[in-house]
Amino acid sequence: MPPKSGKGQKKAGKAKGAPRSDKKRRRKRKESYGIYIYKVMKQVHPDTGISSRAMSIMNSFVNDIFERIAAEASRLAHYNKKSTITSREVQTAVRLLLPGELAKHAVSEGTKAVTKYTTSK
């Protein structure tokens, strides 16, 4: 005799309710750094535009740098037997990954951003 509760039983057939064709399918959202790249570009060069291809390249670049910094910071935390990536690991990762003057500017801008964030809390 089959169990009376519906647990563990699979029913054949389609689920009841409105058919899928009636509903409008929503597109999956694509996340990107596009709006931020655009804002920074307008601060530096207010009269310049950017093509969608150039924006795609810049987005790939930002994603690549982000992944490299995250991987290096993770490695540094692991070497020091820490389970948390702090601003110190990120700063060291930036110093290791970026060359000379670019690293100095990135560290100073990062420090400025962290200070601004902590004071606004």
UniProtKB/Swiss-Prot annotation:
UniProt superkingdom: Eukaryota
UniProt keyword annotations, A-Z: Chromosome, DNA-binding, Glycoprotein, Isopeptide bond, Methylation, Nucleosome core, Nucleus, Ubl conjugation
Posttranslational mods: Monoubiquitination of Lys-116 gives a specific tag for epigenetic transcriptional activation and is also prerequisite for histone H3 'Lys-4' and 'Lys-79' methylation.
Molecular function terms from GO: DNA binding; protein heterodimerization activity; protein-containing complex binding; structural constituent of chromatin
Localization per Swiss-Prot or TrEMBL: Nucleus; Chromosome
Gene Ontology CC terms, in alphabetical order: nucleosome; nucleus
Residue(s) of cross-link: Glycyl lysine isopeptide (Lys-Gly) (interchain with G-Cter in ubiquitin): K116
Keyword Acetylation found: no
The keyword Nucleus belongs to this UniProt entry's keyword annotation: yes
Entry-annotated residues carrying N,N-dimethylproline: P2
Glycan attachment sites: S108
Stretches for region Disordered: 1-30
Pfam families membership: Histone
InterPro entries documented for this protein: Histone-fold, Histone_H2A/H2B/H3, Histone_H2B, HISTONE_H2B_site
Summary of the function given for this chain in its UniProt record: Core component of nucleosome. Nucleosomes wrap and compact DNA into chromatin, limiting DNA accessibility to the cellular machineries which require DNA as a template. Histones thereby play a central role in transcription regulation, DNA repair, DNA replication and chromosomal stability. DNA accessibility is regulated via a complex set of post-translational modifications of histones, also called histone code, and nucleosome remodeling.
Quaternary context: The nucleosome is a histone octamer containing two molecules each of H2A, H2B, H3 and H4 assembled in one H3-H4 heterotetramer and two H2A-H2B heterodimers. The octamer wraps approximately 147 bp of DNA.
Family, as annotated: Belongs to the histone H2B family.
UniProt name for this protein: Histone H2B, sperm
Organism of derivation: Marthasterias glacialis
